[in-house]
Amino acid sequence: MPKLTHFDKKGRAKMVDVSKKGETLREAVVRGSIFMNPKTFKSILSGKIAKGDVLAVAKVAGIMAAKKTSEIIPMCHPLNLSHVEINFYPFEKESRIDIEAKVKIKAPTGVEMEGFVAVATAGLTIYDMCKAIDRGIVLSNIHLVKKTGGKSGTYTSKKFPSPGGRGITLLDKKL
């Protein structure tokens, strides 16, 4: 079992020293799902939510959150991210929207947590903008799909593979 690096010899929490680690290209893909009633789902996709364009706001919120991860998660290093991309995948039968964050950096530490914070924040933003019409919204299954780079190499989830396909972009919503 790998050693937990965020604890000292006495079991107290500490920030990992990454100063001697080399910079490598690191990427993380994190995904989560948000379930809602069919009316809310259709209202989001048709742009009929009173607070505005839900997915556009959720996208910006997710990107902003990724950049602020070290202010939320105590032992995360502050990072100058190279790229953050948020995509949404709608599934009408389940009244579900999958949220995916792709984060990239060349650094001595990974960006998985930035991906998790981006997905969670995008989902929470969707809830916030839609709670007036649907208090039963559920945000779930936030998980690491894939990570590359660093000493541990590549990890790809076998339990939650990415469904593929093309996500909704802001241009798609304007059609």
What is each residue range found by the language model?
Residues 163-167:
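Intrinsically disordered, glycine-rich low-complexity segments
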